[in-house]
UniProtKB/Swiss-Prot annotation:
Keywords: ATP-binding, Glutamine amidotransferase, Ligase, Magnesium, Metal-binding, Nucleotide-binding, Pyrimidine biosynthesis
Gene: pyrG
Binding site for L-glutamine: 54, 355, 383-386, 406, 463
Residues given in the record as Mg(2+) binding sites: 71, 141
Gene Ontology biological process terms from the UniProt entry: 'de novo' CTP biosynthetic process; CTP biosynthetic process; pyrimidine nucleobase biosynthetic process
Cellular component per GO, a single term: cytosol
EC number: 6.3.4.2
Species: Staphylococcus aureus (strain NCTC 8325 / PS 47)
Protein name, UniProt field: CTP synthase
UniProt miscellaneous comment: CTPSs have evolved a hybrid strategy for distinguishing between UTP and CTP. The overlapping regions of the product feedback inhibitory and substrate sites recognize a common feature in both compounds, the triphosphate moiety. To differentiate isosteric substrate and product pyrimidine rings, an additional pocket far from the expected kinase/ligase catalytic site, specifically recognizes the cytosine and ribose portions of the product inhibitor.
InterPro entries, alphabetized: Class_I_gatase-like, CTP_synthase, CTP_synthase_N, GATASE, GATase1_CTP_Synthase, P-loop_NTPase
Length: 536
């Protein structure tokens, strides 16, 4: 039977519940267990797909096309699994589904209430996460902080699930903060005690308490928390601030967290703790020698979480070369043809990531022009690819005013236009081309060198595509279309072979990169940037 672990948080937000959950998932996976993980978000949006990156950070896309919380990126990268649409559940999604059922008459005229209808819907989605993956263990992070009014239906649902499935199949992990009071020179357990008291008042007794702290805890502090929170002493787990997130699984393992969970849930682990690969990764991370400077030219650079997976993928790509990646955050609204060199002259590579909307698009085009004309390694993602074709059309083909129909509906040369199936769609939410699609690679191209194969699969999130009316012109003037959909209709990758490294893709490769397995395009981009740096 599938076992369920619930991770809650108290005292303050941003305690690292997601990292704790994904680190535990990694430990259990390395013990030979089939693990999946999900996030319950208490906000009323159906998904984060239409939310501003300034509000929510990046939108992470799964293989099956779900637009999800950025924490799912942490989960996938840490545990090295591919998640699905059941891995992110929002209050908006739950309420929307219940109200649709009510309108259909599924409740036979009954009064629809938070209990049992909303809580039952939450529990159903919890069970689907396990059923859809045949998981031995489902780890569920509850967003928000214990006591928040928005998360109460989720807390009630996970309380009920213990009665539904049996105590031996359910475990509760609570993350808290142990603040250090500088004036007193000591750490205080009272916030943890009150947080657990709040959780117990809602009917949940934690089995494990993970304590976030700046300093090493004494055994007396652990004993005090165990006494007042009514748990075993060994079930108080210290989680110290770390220089690298990759240290967290090792911290938890050293305190036997995986053993405690396996024993408590009576799991059949196939192996003893195996963290050799993880230790090798951490050794590389802690011994990087030198850095490569990448200019990331974007619209949302004031909130770096908007590009979280891109940043992580760049870091992954630096590890094989033992190089740290220094990201130069460049606000594209400030870049012009005239001042591009001021921002980009000393970078080793230029990356233009995805985005939506007209604002700051001209600055991205100026950055792409600078990369092309000065032979600086360039990598464009999604909108970055679209604007690479726009820049080429304007400055090489001479099509003045060329643009994307998304950004300039009145453009005389719509190099980028709506996907045909999108033309009659008015809603924004959930209507993009989303998820994993195949791409055919053209022989003899940089793309083939990068991937080493003719067919690939990558995740997508876009509504507009390259307009094939301009395909012949671009190819006749030196831009190679190196990747397409299998039917040849949709342009997926472009490159300029006369440059040392100039490649762009319609898909989002950052969603498939792993710390121990960098994505091929990112790795090749960093390799090219390193060569460029060495040849300066």
């Amino acid at each position: 039977m599938t076992k369920f672990i619930f991770v809650t948080g108290g005292v303050v937000s941003s305690l690292g519940k997601g990292i704790t959950a994904s680190s535990l998932g990694r430990l259990l996976k390395d013990r030979g267990l089939n693990v999946t993980i999900q996030k319950f978000d208490p906000y009323l949006n159906v998904d984060p797909g239409t939310m501003s990156p300034y509000q929510h950070g990046e939108v992470f896309v799964t293989d099956d096309g779900a637009e999800t919380d950025l924490d799912l990126g942490h989960y996938e990268r840490f545990i090295d699994i591919n998640l699905n649409k059941f891995s992110n559940v929002t209050a908006g999604k739950v309420y929307s589904h219940v109200l649709k059922k009510e309108r259909r008459g599924d409740y036979l005229g009954g009064t629809v209430q938070v209990i049992p209808h909303i809580t039952n819907e939450i529990k159903e989605r919890l069970l689907l996460a396990g059923e859809s993956t045949n998981a031995d263990v489902v780890i569920t992070e509850i967003g928000g902080t214990t006591g928040d009014i928005e998360s109460l239906p989720f807390i009630e649902a996970i309380r009920q699930i213990r009665s539904d499935l049996g105590r031996e199949n359910v475990m509760y992990v609570h993350c808290t903060l142990l603040p250090y009071i500088k004036a007193a020179g000591e750490m205080k357990t009272k916030p943890t005690q009150h947080s657990v008291k709040e959780l117990r008042g809602l009917g949940i007794q934690p089995d494990l308490i993970v304590v976030r702290t700046e300093y090493e805890m004494t055994q007396d502090l652990k004993d005090k928390i165990a006494l007042f929170c009514d748990i075993n002493k060994e079930s108080v787990i210290e989680c110290r601030d770390a220089d690298s997130l990759y240290e967290i699984p090792l911290q938890l393992s050293q305190q036997n967290m995986d053993d405690i969970v396996i024993k408590r849930l009576q799991l059949n682990a196939k192996y003893e703790t195996q963290l050799d690969e993880w230790k090798q990764l951490l050794d590389i991370v802690n011994n990087l020698d030198g850095k490569i400077t990448i200019g990331l030219v974007g619209k949302y650079v004031s909130l770096q979480d908007a590009y979280l997976s891109v940043v992580e993928s760049l870091k992954h790509a630096g590890y094989p070369f033992a190089k740290d990646i220094d990201i130069r955050w460049i606000d594209s609204s400030e870049v012009t043809d005239e001042n591009a060199a001021e921002y980009l002259a000393d970078v080793d590579g230029i990356l233009v990531p995805g985005g939506f909307g007209f604002r700051a698009s001209e600055g991205k085009i100026s950055a792409i022009k600078y990369a092309r004309e000065n032979n600086v390694p360039f990598f464009g993602i999604c909108l970055g690819m679209q604007l690479a074709t726009v820049e080429f059309s304007r400055n090489v083909l001479g099509l003045e005013g060329a643009h994307s129909a998304e950004l300039d509906p009145a453009t005389p040369y719509p190099i980028i236009d709506l996907l045909p199936e999108q033309k009659d769609i008015e809603d924004l939410g959930g209507t993009l081309r989303l998820g994993l699609y195949s791409c055919s690679i053209k022989e003899g191209t940089l793309a083939q060198d990068v991937y080493g194969k003719a067919e690939i699969e990558e995740r997508h999130r876009h509504r507009y595509e390259f307009n094939n009316d301009y395909r012949e012109q671009l190819e006749a003037n030196g831009m190679v279309i190196s990747g397409t959909s299998p039917d040849g209709r949709l342009v997926e990758m472009v490159e300029i072979p006369t440059n040392d490294f100039f490649i762009a893709c319609q898909f989002h490769p950052e969603f498939l990169s792993r710390p121990n397995r960098p994505h091929p395009i990112f790795k090749s981009f960093i390799e090219a940037s390193l060569k460029y740096q060495q040849n300066k």
